[in-house]
């Protein structure tokens, strides 16, 4: 195999691996590139390698995606193989038969590979919106903010982080595993989200026992119920956060106003220096960020856009327009 062909196959394998483990939509996979590779004599070897990096991946074997997702993926993989004149691959059909005998669950798993070789695995609802909340799944801005954090660990290392609207927990778990914060406070307000969030924290090897990290090198991790409309200044002050983050929480006008209210309280209640604040959001319409910026300006909170980062670790929609704003809160009690 020519060097460029080997490089292309490696890139293709990585794309299939990352997308499958994260259970991304099947149309987003590089099927056309696979079709071209299957014309080569080594096409069957590539398919077997894809099988090992997806359905047979150790992470997937332990915490796989939904049964329906795995079935559809294997069916499409088999169809691509059958479209070329070559011998059948028993391994593909055996894998499909095994999946067909597996019972479906209301929960599925998505896993995201980190540069260290570690991974973050989330248990998520098989429905996009369930129990009346959008917090049970991972949205693209959470992935984008996690990538930025991994590329800029100094912003989080040995610091206390408060995350507003943690949802399924992807961003925080990635930061805890890759950036070594002193402490990390996940927060949300919906009971179903908090239940799943606690489960995901435990699933990834962290302890929720106060002051009892799993080992000497672990961060102290807590999960807090935080209603933005009811939280008090004293509650926020008790967290003593050095950094505050939020991702994909600007999905309606009311939430935007509530978030700015919390940010103003954080600005007013700090005993010493105000925390660094990073808010990531996907621009779904012209109004998505416009209202937030208008409210920040009205509240006197300075903001600046963080330059786009270069490393793309996680599979999310290429066309997604995602922004990270760094907010500067001026502590009234600063030194």
Swiss-Prot record:
Question: Which key words tag this protein in UniProt?
Answer: Acetylation, Cytoplasm, Methyltransferase, S-adenosyl-L-methionine, Transferase
Any matching Pfam family: FAM86
Q: What is its EC number?
A: 2.1.1.-
Q: What superkingdom heads the lineage?
A: Eukaryota
Location of N-acetylmethionine modifications: 1
A GO cellular component entry from the record: cytoplasm
The reply to whether Zinc figures as a keyword in the UniProt entry is no
**Compartments, as annotated in UniProt:** Cytoplasm
Give any single GO term for biological process: peptidyl-lysine trimethylation
**EC category name:** transferase
Which positions in this protein are listed as binding S-adenosyl-L-methionine?
139, 165-167, 228, 247
Query: Could you tell me one molecular function GO term of this UniProt entry?
Result: protein-lysine N-methyltransferase activity
| Location, primary (coarse class) | cytoplasm
From the UniProt record, list the reaction(s) this protein catalyses: L-lysyl-[protein] + 3 S-adenosyl-L-methionine = N(6),N(6),N(6)-trimethyl-L-lysyl-[protein] + 3 S-adenosyl-L-homocysteine + 3 H(+)
Q: What does this protein do?
A: Catalyzes the trimethylation of eukaryotic elongation factor 2 (EEF2) on 'Lys-525'.
Q: Which family does it belong to?
A: Belongs to the class I-like SAM-binding methyltransferase superfamily. EEF2KMT family.
- Assembly: Interacts with FAM86B2 and FAM86C1P.
PANTHER family for this protein = HEPATOCELLULAR CARCINOMA-ASSOCIATED ANTIGEN (PTHR14614), PROTEIN-LYSINE N-METHYLTRANSFERASE EEF2KMT (PTHR14614:SF130)
Q: What is this protein called?
A: Protein-lysine N-methyltransferase EEF2KMT
Q: Which organism is it from?
A: Mus musculus
Q: What is the lineage of its organism?
A: Eukaryota, Metazoa, Chordata, Craniata, Vertebrata
